[in-house]
């Protein structure tokens, strides 16, 4: 197998912002938000499950609009979380309907993010019904983007953006669990902005954080920590191009660093997969999408059988799922990942 691509059914006109994980029975649980288009009040978080036969279940609503603080709230990006005891949870961001939409730009409705908050809710995997959403803590202007990451010590990281009153974006890391509570442990800042963090822990305990560049003609930001999410280094730019779009990283037991990103300064195509065997200094890369259109917000997943998958927005119409062979990526083109020191 080089790679195999499947388009996940989507019953709404538009789809974006997926996250996925493997559940205890070996199936893959995928979620994304969908509606008329991004930023319209009719969006909900949908989900589908990839069964043992490789087929995807009929999509269903996972997180609908809900009542909170005397308002109706609209959910956006959501990410699954499976606890050691088998409990299924979802973490998501949402904003009050009264302040959800504030302007239209390039066929998108941009949201008033300063009122967005983080929530979590328990899920019944027998019916995929959701419990009452609960705020993680009392803070506004937080938007979930990345997948939830379990660290070697068992705690979880929730990966978010925050934005100040001047509109500058930063990356915010939240640590904890649904039962033990959550706290903000790190806020990473760099001009003109770094957002949508993705974190991977290497076998030696080191943590790497790669982030979207808040603008065009920039490169992916990188920060690292010896072993604690509270002491990441000041972000610095890599040499990996970024068109103001989401990226994702992951690591395997061999210490290889995987990355999925758009290898462009301006376009959300091509969509590129890369593997580094030297901690991100160099990569071997291949493109899995090269045609016109948007192929964005990738999420990497290694399942318990050792197989690698990537999920991403496919032309804003649905979510694509690709299974790929790392050996195929490793035979690809060489790419520098960091400026020489």
Residue ranges and their predicted role:
Residues 1-341:
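Asp-box/BNR beta-propeller blade signature and adjacent active/binding-site loops
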């Amino acid at each position: 197998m080089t790679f195999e691509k499947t388009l996940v059914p989507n019953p709404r006109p538009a789809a974006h912002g997926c996250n996925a994980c493997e559940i205890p029975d070996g199936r893959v649980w995928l979620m994304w938000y969908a509606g008329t288009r991004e930023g319209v009040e009719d969006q909900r978080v949908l989900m589908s499950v990839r069964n043992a036969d490789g087929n995807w279940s009929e999509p269903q609503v996972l997180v609908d609009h809900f009542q909170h603080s005397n308002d109706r709230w609209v959910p956006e990006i959501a990410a699954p979380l499976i606890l050691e005891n088998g409990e299924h949870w979802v973490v998501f961001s949402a904003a009050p309907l009264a302040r959800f939409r504030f302007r239209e730009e390039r066929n998108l409705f941009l949201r008033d993010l300063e009122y967005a908050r983080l929530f979590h809710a328990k899920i019944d995997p027998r019916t995929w019904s959701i419990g009452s959403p609960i705020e993680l803590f009392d803070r506004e202007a937080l938007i979930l983007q990345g997948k939830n990451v379990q660290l070697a010590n068992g705690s979880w990281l929730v990966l978010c953006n925050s934005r100040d009153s001047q509109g500058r974006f930063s990356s915010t890391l939240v640590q904890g669990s649904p039962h033990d509570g959550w706290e903000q442990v790190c806020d990473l800042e760099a001009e003109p902005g770094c957002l949508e963090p993705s974190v991977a822990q290497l076998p030696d305990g080191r943590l790497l954080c790669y982030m979207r560049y808040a603008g065009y003609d920039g490169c992916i930001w990188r920060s690292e920590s010896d072993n604690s999410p509270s002491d990441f280094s000041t972000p610095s730019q890599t040499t990996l191009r970024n068109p103001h779009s989401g990226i994702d990283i992951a690591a395997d037991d061999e210490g290889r660093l995987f990355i999925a990103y758009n290898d462009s300064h301006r376009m959300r195509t091509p969509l590129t997969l890369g593997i580094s065997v030297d901690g991100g200094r160099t990569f071997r890369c291949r493109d899995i999408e090269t045609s016109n259109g948007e192929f964005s917000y990738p999420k990497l997943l290694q399942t318990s059988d050792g197989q690698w998958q990537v999920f991403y927005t496919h032309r804003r119409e649905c979510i694509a799922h690709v299974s790929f062979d790392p050996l195929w990526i490793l035979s690809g083109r060489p790419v520098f990942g960091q400026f020489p020191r």
